[in-house]
């Protein structure tokens, strides 16, 4: 049975690429045609790639690999958080901070600081501080929650990065490749398929397209871990 059908992808607008002048020639094998100055993605190729990505992701999850979902653009932010949480993965959905992977020791210290501040807030320790100091601590807490909240359960580097919009997340791509962390990437017609291990050619701007792809990948992770794609948990948060 196909992981995703052609009609589902059509309804999600997964076939719409970018303007032809913005294309990356390396994506030519995934492009069906050009229409009104816009490239149309070959959804038969997308279906094949989705099947491969599902199997690869499921196998990785079954072997205990940990996942990081990355997508900071407005259209993807909410979906990234939702689907990562559903399959127990970590996520970055606001802004990629330099060194999130390559300077992990420093990043982990900031995550630990976030946890400390959350404990202080919940215990009332911040409220007991002088008003000015409490205000400073709460601003720090708010900022850390915004940018690092999706990483609180990530005790070590991820084994796999799932990416929305390769062009936007250039720093995440560079850091993952530097550390030999494989990438499962949604690739629009302006992307480079050579920069990922598991390509999924599709529209990475439409919310429904992002929902469709990330939803299936989250299903694959849950199936690999639990034998069902309905399981919800926080497996990446467990040692």
Swiss-Prot record:
Cleaved signal peptide residues: none
Top-level taxon: Bacteria
GO BP field: translation
CDD domains found in the cross-reference section: RPS2 (cd01425)
This protein's GO CC annotations: cytosolic small ribosomal subunit
GO molecular function, one term: structural constituent of ribosome
A Pfam family per the record: Ribosomal_S2
Entry keyword annotation includes Ribosomal protein: yes
Keywords assigned: Ribonucleoprotein, Ribosomal protein
InterPro entries: Ribosomal_uS2, Ribosomal_uS2_bac/mit/plastid, Ribosomal_uS2_CS, Ribosomal_uS2_flav_dom_sf
Transmembrane segment boundaries: none
HAMAP family: Ribosomal_uS2_B (MF_00291_B)
NCBIfam families in UniProt: rpsB_bact
Family membership: Belongs to the universal ribosomal protein uS2 family.
Protein name: Small ribosomal subunit protein uS2
């Amino acid at each position: 049975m196909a992981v995703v059908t052609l009609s589902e992808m059509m309804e999600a607008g997964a076939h719409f690429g970018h303007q032809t002048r913005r294309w990356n020639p390396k994506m030519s094998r995934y492009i069906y045609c050009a229409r009104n100055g816009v490239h149309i993605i070959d959804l038969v190729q997308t279906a094949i790639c989705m099947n491969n990505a599902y199997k690869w992701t499921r196998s990785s999850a079954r072997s205990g690999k940990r996942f990081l979902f990355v997508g900071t653009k407005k259209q993807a932010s909410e979906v990234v958080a939702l689907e990562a949480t559903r399959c127990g993965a970590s996520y970055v959905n606001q802004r990629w901070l330099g060194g999130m992977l390559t300077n992990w020791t420093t990043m982990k210290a900031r995550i630990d600081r976030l946890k400390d501040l959350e404990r202080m807030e919940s215990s009332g320790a911040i409220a007991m501080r002088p008003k000015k100091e409490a205000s400073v601590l709460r601003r720090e807490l708010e900022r850390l929650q915004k940018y690092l909240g999706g990483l609180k359960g990530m005790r070590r580097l991820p084994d796999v990065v799932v990416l929305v919009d390769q062009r936007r997340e250039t720093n995440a791509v560079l850091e993952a490749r530097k550390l030999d962390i494989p990438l499962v990437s949604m690739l629009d017609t302006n992307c480079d398929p050579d920069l990922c291990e598991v390509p999924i050619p599709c529209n990475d701007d439409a919310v429904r397209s992002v929902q469709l792809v990330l939803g299936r990948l989250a299903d694959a992770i849950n199936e690999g871990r639990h034998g069902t794609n309905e399981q919800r948990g926080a497996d990446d948060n467990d040692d």
